[in-house]
Protein backbone atom coordinates (compact mmCIF):
# COMPACT_ATOMS: atom_id res chain seq x y z
CA UNK A 1 0.00 0.00 0.00
CA UNK A 2 2.67 2.50 1.05
CA UNK A 3 4.65 1.70 -2.09
CA UNK A 4 1.84 3.05 -4.25
CA UNK A 5 1.56 6.14 -2.06
CA UNK A 6 5.29 6.84 -1.88
CA UNK A 7 5.49 8.89 -5.12
CA UNK A 8 2.96 11.29 -3.59
CA UNK A 9 4.86 11.38 -0.31
CA UNK A 10 8.13 11.96 -2.15
CA UNK A 11 6.62 14.82 -4.14
CA UNK A 12 5.77 16.59 -0.89
CA UNK A 13 9.15 15.84 0.68
CA UNK A 14 11.01 17.06 -2.42
CA UNK A 15 9.28 20.43 -2.11
CA UNK A 16 11.06 20.86 1.22
CA UNK A 17 14.69 21.63 1.95
CA UNK A 18 16.55 18.31 1.64
CA UNK A 19 17.74 18.19 5.24
CA UNK A 20 14.38 19.30 6.64
CA UNK A 21 12.74 16.50 4.66
CA UNK A 22 15.33 14.09 6.02
CA UNK A 23 14.49 15.03 9.62
CA UNK A 24 10.75 14.79 8.96
CA UNK A 25 11.24 11.33 7.48
CA UNK A 26 13.14 10.23 10.57
CA UNK A 27 10.37 11.50 12.84
CA UNK A 28 7.79 9.60 10.80
CA UNK A 29 9.89 6.44 10.86
CA UNK A 30 10.35 6.72 14.61
CA UNK A 31 6.59 7.04 15.09
CA UNK A 32 5.88 4.20 12.65
CA UNK A 33 8.32 1.97 14.51
CA UNK A 34 6.57 2.61 17.82
CA UNK A 35 3.09 1.93 16.43
CA UNK A 36 3.87 -0.90 14.02
CA UNK A 37 2.45 1.14 11.15
CA UNK A 38 5.55 0.77 8.98
CA UNK A 39 5.25 -3.00 8.84
CA UNK A 40 1.54 -2.83 8.06
CA UNK A 41 2.06 -0.50 5.09
CA UNK A 42 5.32 -1.84 3.66
CA UNK A 43 5.39 -4.33 0.77
CA UNK A 44 6.05 -7.96 1.64
CA UNK A 45 9.71 -8.87 1.27
CA UNK A 46 10.68 -12.53 0.78
CA UNK A 47 13.16 -14.22 3.08
CA UNK A 48 16.31 -15.26 1.26
CA UNK A 49 18.82 -16.00 4.03
CA UNK A 50 22.54 -15.50 3.44
CA UNK A 51 25.45 -16.28 5.74
CA UNK A 52 28.20 -13.67 5.46
CA UNK A 53 30.93 -12.76 7.98
CA UNK A 54 29.61 -15.62 10.10
CA UNK A 55 26.26 -13.84 10.45
CA UNK A 56 22.83 -14.76 9.11
CA UNK A 57 21.10 -12.08 7.03
CA UNK A 58 17.34 -12.48 6.49
CA UNK A 59 17.81 -11.27 2.94
CA UNK A 60 20.83 -9.69 1.22
CA UNK A 61 19.40 -6.15 0.95
CA UNK A 62 20.43 -3.78 3.73
CA UNK A 63 20.16 -0.13 4.63
CA UNK A 64 23.43 1.80 4.36
CA UNK A 65 24.66 4.00 7.18
CA UNK A 66 23.93 7.71 7.04
CA UNK A 67 20.14 7.74 7.00
CA UNK A 68 19.78 7.09 10.74
CA UNK A 69 22.94 8.54 12.24
CA UNK A 70 21.83 8.21 15.87
CA UNK A 71 20.16 4.80 15.72
CA UNK A 72 16.82 6.31 16.72
CA UNK A 73 14.66 4.77 13.96
CA UNK A 74 15.83 1.16 13.86
CA UNK A 75 12.42 -0.42 14.43
CA UNK A 76 10.68 1.69 11.80
CA UNK A 77 13.37 0.98 9.23
CA UNK A 78 13.50 -2.74 9.98
CA UNK A 79 9.76 -3.03 9.35
CA UNK A 80 10.30 -1.97 5.73
CA UNK A 81 11.80 -5.34 4.83
CA UNK A 82 15.55 -4.74 4.97
CA UNK A 83 17.58 -7.88 5.59
CA UNK A 84 19.90 -5.87 7.80
CA UNK A 85 20.19 -2.33 9.11
CA UNK A 86 23.33 -0.20 9.48
CA UNK A 87 23.17 2.98 11.56
CA UNK A 88 25.68 5.77 12.23
CA UNK A 89 28.23 7.12 11.60
CA UNK A 90 28.74 7.81 15.31
CA UNK A 91 31.69 9.59 16.93
CA UNK A 92 32.91 9.57 20.54
CA UNK A 93 31.50 13.02 21.31
CA UNK A 94 28.41 14.77 19.95
CA UNK A 95 29.15 17.20 17.14
CA UNK A 96 26.99 19.44 14.94
CA UNK A 97 28.65 18.63 11.63
CA UNK A 98 29.21 21.19 8.91
CA UNK A 99 27.16 24.39 8.52
CA UNK A 100 23.84 24.25 6.64
CA UNK A 101 22.90 24.03 3.85
CA UNK A 102 24.77 20.75 3.52
CA UNK A 103 22.47 18.40 1.59
CA UNK A 104 21.37 18.90 -2.02
CA UNK A 105 19.21 16.86 -4.37
CA UNK A 106 20.05 16.45 -8.06
CA UNK A 107 16.83 14.79 -9.28
CA UNK A 108 17.82 14.97 -12.94
CA UNK A 109 20.63 12.54 -12.09
CA UNK A 110 18.88 10.55 -9.32
CA UNK A 111 21.59 11.83 -7.01
CA UNK A 112 22.32 13.62 -3.76
CA UNK A 113 25.31 15.68 -2.65
CA UNK A 114 25.94 15.92 1.07
CA UNK A 115 28.59 17.45 3.27
CA UNK A 116 26.97 16.60 6.60
CA UNK A 117 30.23 16.01 8.44
CA UNK A 118 29.30 13.19 10.84
CA UNK A 119 26.66 15.23 12.69
CA UNK A 120 25.48 13.02 15.56
CA UNK A 121 24.54 12.98 19.24
CA UNK A 122 27.65 11.06 20.33
CA UNK A 123 28.26 7.42 21.13
CA UNK A 124 26.67 7.43 24.59
CA UNK A 125 23.27 8.52 23.24
CA UNK A 126 23.74 6.25 20.23
CA UNK A 127 24.16 3.20 22.48
CA UNK A 128 21.05 4.15 24.47
CA UNK A 129 19.03 4.36 21.26
CA UNK A 130 20.32 1.02 20.01
CA UNK A 131 19.51 -0.64 23.33
CA UNK A 132 15.97 0.77 23.24
CA UNK A 133 15.20 -0.79 19.84
CA UNK A 134 13.12 -3.97 19.75
CA UNK A 135 14.74 -5.14 16.50
CA UNK A 136 16.71 -8.37 16.91
CA UNK A 137 17.89 -8.82 13.35
CA UNK A 138 21.36 -8.18 11.96
CA UNK A 139 22.51 -4.70 12.98
CA UNK A 140 25.63 -2.90 11.80
CA UNK A 141 27.00 -0.01 13.84
CA UNK A 142 29.15 2.45 11.89
CA UNK A 143 31.93 4.34 13.72
CA UNK A 144 34.04 7.39 12.85
CA UNK A 145 36.20 10.09 14.35
CA UNK A 146 35.36 13.54 15.69
CA UNK A 147 36.17 16.45 13.38
CA UNK A 148 38.45 18.09 15.97
CA UNK A 149 40.47 14.94 16.66
CA UNK A 150 43.87 15.25 14.92
CA UNK A 151 44.28 12.67 12.20
CA UNK A 152 47.32 11.35 14.06
CA UNK A 153 44.99 10.43 16.97
CA UNK A 154 42.16 9.07 14.83
CA UNK A 155 42.74 5.52 16.06
CA UNK A 156 41.87 6.64 19.59
CA UNK A 157 38.37 7.66 18.45
CA UNK A 158 37.77 4.44 16.55
CA UNK A 159 38.97 2.31 19.44
CA UNK A 160 36.80 4.20 21.92
CA UNK A 161 33.70 3.84 19.75
CA UNK A 162 34.44 0.17 19.09
CA UNK A 163 34.57 -0.53 22.80
CA UNK A 164 31.29 1.31 23.44
CA UNK A 165 29.25 -0.23 20.61
CA UNK A 166 30.75 -3.73 20.60
CA UNK A 167 28.25 -5.47 22.94
CA UNK A 168 25.28 -4.26 20.88
CA UNK A 169 26.48 -4.81 17.30
CA UNK A 170 26.10 -7.72 14.91
CA UNK A 171 29.02 -6.16 13.05
CA UNK A 172 30.93 -2.87 13.27
CA UNK A 173 31.81 -0.74 10.24
CA UNK A 174 34.93 1.42 10.35
CA UNK A 175 34.23 4.48 8.20
CA UNK A 176 37.45 6.00 6.87
CA UNK A 177 36.03 7.18 3.56
CA UNK A 178 33.67 10.09 4.15
CA UNK A 179 34.91 13.08 2.14
CA UNK A 180 33.30 15.49 4.62
CA UNK A 181 35.69 15.13 7.58
CA UNK A 182 39.01 16.85 6.92
CA UNK A 183 41.87 14.46 6.09
CA UNK A 184 39.80 11.36 6.92
CA UNK A 185 40.55 9.65 3.62
CA UNK A 186 44.25 9.82 4.48
CA UNK A 187 43.54 6.77 6.62
CA UNK A 188 43.15 4.76 3.39
CA UNK A 189 46.91 5.20 2.81
CA UNK A 190 49.00 2.06 3.22
CA UNK A 191 50.88 2.98 6.40
CA UNK A 192 47.98 4.69 8.12
CA UNK A 193 45.56 1.87 7.29
CA UNK A 194 47.97 -0.83 8.42
CA UNK A 195 48.40 0.81 11.83
CA UNK A 196 44.67 1.45 12.26
CA UNK A 197 43.56 -2.07 11.35
CA UNK A 198 46.24 -3.60 13.57
CA UNK A 199 44.98 -1.58 16.54
CA UNK A 200 41.34 -2.41 15.78
CA UNK A 201 41.97 -6.14 15.44
CA UNK A 202 43.88 -6.19 18.71
CA UNK A 203 41.00 -4.37 20.42
CA UNK A 204 38.47 -6.70 18.79
CA UNK A 205 40.20 -9.76 20.22
CA UNK A 206 40.31 -8.30 23.71
CA UNK A 207 36.63 -7.35 23.50
CA UNK A 208 35.76 -10.82 22.20
CA UNK A 209 37.45 -12.35 25.24
CA UNK A 210 35.62 -9.94 27.54
CA UNK A 211 32.14 -10.38 26.02
CA UNK A 212 32.38 -13.97 24.87
CA UNK A 213 31.57 -13.21 21.23
CA UNK A 214 33.51 -12.12 18.15
CA UNK A 215 31.84 -9.18 16.42
CA UNK A 216 33.02 -8.90 12.79
CA UNK A 217 34.68 -5.71 11.55
CA UNK A 218 34.04 -4.22 8.10
CA UNK A 219 35.95 -1.36 6.46
CA UNK A 220 34.05 1.23 4.39
CA UNK A 221 36.09 2.59 1.50
CA UNK A 222 35.78 5.29 -1.17
CA UNK A 223 35.11 4.86 -4.90
CA UNK A 224 37.83 7.38 -5.77
CA UNK A 225 40.70 4.87 -5.71
CA UNK A 226 43.16 3.83 -8.40
CA UNK A 227 44.22 0.23 -9.00
CA UNK A 228 47.29 0.51 -6.78
CA UNK A 229 45.24 1.91 -3.89
CA UNK A 230 42.62 -0.85 -4.19
CA UNK A 231 45.37 -3.48 -4.18
CA UNK A 232 47.02 -1.91 -1.14
CA UNK A 233 43.73 -1.82 0.77
CA UNK A 234 42.97 -5.42 -0.21
CA UNK A 235 46.40 -6.58 0.93
CA UNK A 236 45.93 -4.81 4.27
CA UNK A 237 42.48 -6.33 4.78
CA UNK A 238 43.89 -9.79 4.11
CA UNK A 239 46.92 -9.29 6.31
CA UNK A 240 44.82 -8.28 9.29
CA UNK A 241 42.04 -10.78 8.56
CA UNK A 242 39.33 -8.13 8.47
CA UNK A 243 35.94 -9.78 8.22
CA UNK A 244 34.37 -7.53 5.57
CA UNK A 245 34.62 -4.47 3.34
CA UNK A 246 31.89 -2.07 2.21
CA UNK A 247 32.36 -0.63 -1.28
CA UNK A 248 31.69 2.20 -1.66
CA UNK A 249 31.06 5.53 0.00
CA UNK A 250 30.23 8.72 -1.92
CA UNK A 251 32.40 10.14 -4.70
CA UNK A 252 34.11 13.50 -5.16
CA UNK A 253 33.80 13.18 -8.94
CA UNK A 254 31.31 15.43 -10.71
CA UNK A 255 31.81 14.09 -14.24
CA UNK A 256 28.30 12.63 -14.46
CA UNK A 257 26.50 15.72 -13.15
CA UNK A 258 28.34 18.60 -14.81
CA UNK A 259 26.08 21.55 -15.50
CA UNK A 260 23.26 20.43 -13.21
CA UNK A 261 21.97 22.65 -10.39
CA UNK A 262 24.03 22.10 -7.20
CA UNK A 263 26.65 20.04 -9.08
CA UNK A 264 29.42 22.34 -7.87
CA UNK A 265 28.48 22.04 -4.19
CA UNK A 266 31.24 20.57 -2.03
CA UNK A 267 30.64 17.14 -0.55
CA UNK A 268 30.12 13.53 -1.51
CA UNK A 269 27.95 12.61 -4.50
CA UNK A 270 25.74 9.54 -4.11
CA UNK A 271 23.09 7.85 -6.22
CA UNK A 272 23.03 6.69 -9.82
CA UNK A 273 26.25 8.52 -10.87
CA UNK A 274 28.38 6.43 -8.47
CA UNK A 275 27.01 3.07 -9.68
CA UNK A 276 29.70 2.22 -12.23
CA UNK A 277 32.61 3.45 -10.11
CA UNK A 278 31.38 1.42 -7.16
CA UNK A 279 31.03 -1.70 -9.29
CA UNK A 280 34.54 -1.25 -10.64
CA UNK A 281 36.00 -1.06 -7.13
CA UNK A 282 34.01 -4.17 -6.16
CA UNK A 283 35.38 -6.08 -9.18
CA UNK A 284 38.95 -5.05 -8.39
CA UNK A 285 38.56 -5.94 -4.72
CA UNK A 286 37.12 -9.35 -5.53
CA UNK A 287 40.05 -10.07 -7.85
CA UNK A 288 42.45 -9.26 -5.00
CA UNK A 289 40.73 -10.84 -1.98
CA UNK A 290 38.97 -13.78 -3.64
CA UNK A 291 36.46 -15.21 -1.20
CA UNK A 292 38.48 -14.35 1.90
CA UNK A 293 36.92 -10.93 2.58
CA UNK A 294 33.18 -10.60 1.86
CA UNK A 295 32.15 -7.41 0.06
CA UNK A 296 28.99 -5.41 0.76
CA UNK A 297 28.15 -3.46 -2.38
CA UNK A 298 26.60 -0.01 -2.16
CA UNK A 299 26.27 2.87 -4.58
CA UNK A 300 23.63 3.76 -7.14
CA UNK A 301 21.19 0.86 -6.73
CA UNK A 302 17.80 1.86 -8.16
CA UNK A 303 16.42 -1.52 -9.30
CA UNK A 304 16.61 -5.24 -8.77
CA UNK A 305 18.88 -5.46 -11.81
CA UNK A 306 21.23 -2.92 -10.22
CA UNK A 307 21.39 -5.01 -7.05
CA UNK A 308 22.17 -8.11 -9.09
CA UNK A 309 24.94 -6.22 -10.89
CA UNK A 310 26.63 -5.63 -7.53
CA UNK A 311 26.58 -9.36 -6.83
CA UNK A 312 27.81 -10.10 -10.34
CA UNK A 313 30.73 -7.73 -9.69
CA UNK A 314 31.66 -9.69 -6.57
CA UNK A 315 29.54 -8.47 -3.66
CA UNK A 316 27.84 -10.88 -1.26
CA UNK A 317 25.31 -8.35 0.06
CA UNK A 318 24.05 -4.93 -1.00
CA UNK A 319 22.96 -1.75 0.75
CA UNK A 320 20.59 1.03 -0.29
CA UNK A 321 20.51 4.72 0.55
CA UNK A 322 19.94 7.27 -2.21
CA UNK A 323 17.84 4.86 -4.27
CA UNK A 324 15.70 4.31 -1.18
CA UNK A 325 15.18 8.07 -0.88
CA UNK A 326 14.07 8.32 -4.50
CA UNK A 327 12.04 5.10 -4.76
CA UNK A 328 10.98 4.27 -1.21
CA UNK A 329 10.20 0.85 0.30
CA UNK A 330 9.24 -0.64 -3.08
CA UNK A 331 12.94 -0.71 -3.94
CA UNK A 332 13.72 -2.91 -0.93
CA UNK A 333 11.14 -5.48 -2.02
CA UNK A 334 12.18 -5.33 -5.69
CA UNK A 335 15.85 -5.90 -4.90
CA UNK A 336 15.16 -8.68 -2.40
CA UNK A 337 12.84 -10.44 -4.85
CA UNK A 338 15.34 -10.16 -7.70
CA UNK A 339 18.17 -11.59 -5.60
CA UNK A 340 15.95 -14.34 -4.17
CA UNK A 341 14.94 -15.41 -7.69
CA UNK A 342 18.57 -15.44 -8.81
CA UNK A 343 19.54 -17.60 -5.83
CA UNK A 344 16.70 -20.08 -6.36
UniProtKB/Swiss-Prot annotation:
The active site is at 178 (nucleophile). Coiled coil: none annotated. The keyword Membrane applies. One of its GO terms (cellular component) is plasma membrane. FMN binds at residues 65-69, 89, 142, 175, 220, 248, 271, 300, 321-322. GO terms for molecular function: dihydroorotate dehydrogenase (quinone) activity. It is an enzyme of class 1 (oxidoreductase). GO terms for biological process: 'de novo' pyrimidine nucleobase biosynthetic process; 'de novo' UMP biosynthetic process. SUPFAM superfamilies: FMN-linked oxidoreductases. Belongs to the dihydroorotate dehydrogenase family. Type 2 subfamily. PANTHER family: DIHYDROOROTATE DEHYDROGENASE (QUINONE), MITOCHONDRIAL (PTHR48109:SF4), DIHYDROOROTATE DEHYDROGENASE (QUINONE), MITOCHONDRIAL-RELATED (PTHR48109). This is Dihydroorotate dehydrogenase (quinone). The lineage of its organism: Bacteria, Pseudomonadati, Pseudomonadota, Betaproteobacteria, Burkholderiales. The gene is pyrD.
Amino acid sequence: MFSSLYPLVRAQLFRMDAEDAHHLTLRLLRAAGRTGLAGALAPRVPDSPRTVMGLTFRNPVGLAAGLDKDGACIDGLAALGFGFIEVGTVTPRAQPGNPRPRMFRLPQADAVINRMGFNNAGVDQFVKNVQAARYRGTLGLNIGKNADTPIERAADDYLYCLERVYPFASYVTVNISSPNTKNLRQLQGAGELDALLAALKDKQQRLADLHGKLVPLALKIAPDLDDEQVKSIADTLLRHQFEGVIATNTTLSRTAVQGLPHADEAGGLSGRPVFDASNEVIRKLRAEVGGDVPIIGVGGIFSGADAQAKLDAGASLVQLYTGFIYRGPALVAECAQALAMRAA
